[in-house]
Swiss-Prot record:
Residues 20-117 form the Ig-like domain. One of its GO terms (molecular function) is antigen binding. This is Immunoglobulin heavy variable 1-45. Keywords: Adaptive immunity, Cell membrane, Disulfide bond, Immunity, Immunoglobulin, Immunoglobulin domain, Membrane, Secreted, Signal. It comes from Homo sapiens.
Amino acid sequence: MDWTWRILFLVAAVTDAYSQMQLVQSGAEVKKTGSSVKVSCKASGYTFTYRYLHWVRQAPGQALEWMGWITPFNGNTNYAQKFQDRVTITRDRSMSTAYMELSSLRSEDTAMYYCAR
């Protein structure tokens, strides 16, 4: 596989053992540079609209990097300046699911992407 032209997106499921709250993300993605990716995060075990939902990422050997948040109740968003022009966070209240779309992918976007409450 030619990794020069592809970007690997990995996602993880996060569980809160105390409240049985779960955030379950979509699976790994391999994308070409210049393309876009949309990752989903389905919430359960709590009222989806009551909590901010954040997206963070961690590139290999790097610290966690905050990308932005959404308020599921009204859809308000706030993005880190670094991603302002390339990231879009949305939500589907009826499905208790949030989405993070990252466009104009670069090799340095190779990372683990997490949603977090």
